[in-house]
Amino acid sequence: MNSILREASPKSPHVHFNAIEGILELKGRSIPENALDFYKPLIEWMGEWVKSSPAKTEFHVHLEYFNTSSSKCLLDLFRKLEPLGDNATVLWHYEADDEDMLEAGEDYEAILSVPFRMMKV
């Protein structure tokens, strides 16, 4: 399975889905013109990743900001991890003074069966 590496742009996050190490990362801002176009290949990759039965998956999410359409796509990404149970963890990184981002992570945690860890930076 191939890894994915995309550099950040002013409207889209840095993406590094490392298939060898099982470490997935989204970092930056997520306000693409068409969130589905941006996230669809990532969601499909995640589906294949889960089918490969990885021993461990760490999904680091460190977003400064994301829009509503990105929010739905993030939910779809996280849902793909649910079959992995405790073998997958979402590490939700947020700035110490960013209560909105902390609450967003807690909202995802409340509606999903994927373990989340809130990481204050």
Q: Each PLM stretch: what is its role?
A:
Residues L42, E58-E109:
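Amphipathic alpha-helical interaction surfaces in cytosolic regulatory modules
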